[in-house]
Amino acid sequence: MYTNSDFVVIKALEDGVNVIGLTRGADTRFHHSEKLDKGEVLIAQFTEHTSAIKVRGKAYIQTRHGVIESEGKK
């Protein structure tokens, strides 16, 4: 079990927000993706396999470091 795992809360502010998990290691790759509709919430966790999370679309993103709002699609 990965003990230093932070959680991230992502709430979609529009339909079609993409949340993509990226892997650790020499080659960064996509390993999981979710599509959220307006109002849906995803709680994600950094693990031994997930080193980054990419959010595409308008969403609130909350971490232990604070809250940020991503921009919507143009």
UniProtKB/Swiss-Prot annotation:
Gene3D superfamilies per the UniProt record, alphabetical: TRAP-like (2.60.40.50)
GO biological process, alphabetically ordered: DNA-templated transcription termination; regulation of DNA-templated transcription
UniProt keyword Mitochondrion present: no
GO terms of molecular function: identical protein binding; RNA binding
Membership in a protein family: Belongs to the MtrB family.
InterPro entries: MtrB, Trp_RNA-bd_attenuator-like_dom, Trp_RNA-bd_attenuator_dom
Subunit structure: Oligomer of 11 identical subunits arranged in doughnut-like structure.
Entry protein name: Transcription attenuation protein MtrB
Domain of life: Bacteria
Entry's transmembrane regions: none
Function field: Required for transcription attenuation control in the Trp operon. This trans-acting factor seems to recognize a 10 bases nucleotide sequence in the Trp leader transcript causing transcription termination. Binds the leader RNA only in presence of L-tryptophan.
Biological source species: Geobacillus stearothermophilus (Bacillus stearothermophilus)
HAMAP family given in the database record: Trp_attenuator
Phylogenetic placement of the source organism: Bacteria, Bacillati, Bacillota, Bacilli, Bacillales
Keywords for the protein's UniProt record, in alphabetical order: RNA-binding, Transcription, Transcription regulation
Protein encoded by which gene: mtrB
